[in-house]
Amino acid sequence: MKIENNKVVVDTYAWIEYFNGTEKGEKVKKFLIEEYTYTPEIVLAEIARKYIREGASLETVKQRLRIIGELSVTVGIDYKIALESGKAYLELLDHSKKLKLKAKPGLGDAIILATAKVLNAKVLTGDQHFKKIKITIWIGE
């Protein structure tokens, strides 16, 4: 049974693990079944880019995007999320420097974090930019 207070934003990393059927993907599946899950629309674009770049058929890409829409609520960018994204980017940038990560966070990462904050949710991910952030449910290494 889903508990309304248990809101989870599923990021690109988590969806890829889910579609790959990995052990981490099994953890994601559990959240999709047991929690109220949300996916920022930017994640749909990132998923499409990844699979198209890897040569997946458009039908496969469409099917995966439909699955995301069936298993979670997709969330667009409104003014609250846009404003929060600006703050979230700076937070992630500072956090990445503390973790001594080579890659800077992207705008997509900021939108994902902002969406979680606006929804008062946690972020389900294994993306290094989110590691050790308070609202992260970590499924990475």
What feature does the model see in each segment?
Residues 54-58, 92-93, 140-141:
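Short, hinge-like loop/turn segments at secondary-structure boundaries
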Residues 1-3, 113, 117-141:
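Acidic, PIN/NYN-like endoribonuclease modules and their adjacent C-terminal/linker elements
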Residues 15-16, 44, 82, 130-131:
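A generic structural signal for short hydrophobic patches within well-formed alpha-helices
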Residues 1-40, 50-66:
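Short, well-structured N-terminal submotif of metal-dependent ribonuclease cores
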Residues 74-122:
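Active-site neighborhoods of divalent-metal-dependent phosphate/nucleic-acid chemistry enzymes
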Residues 5-6, 34-37, 70-73, 117-122:
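Short active-site oxyanion
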Residues 10-11, 39-40, 105-106, 127, ...:
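Histidine- and aromatic-rich ligand-binding microenvironments
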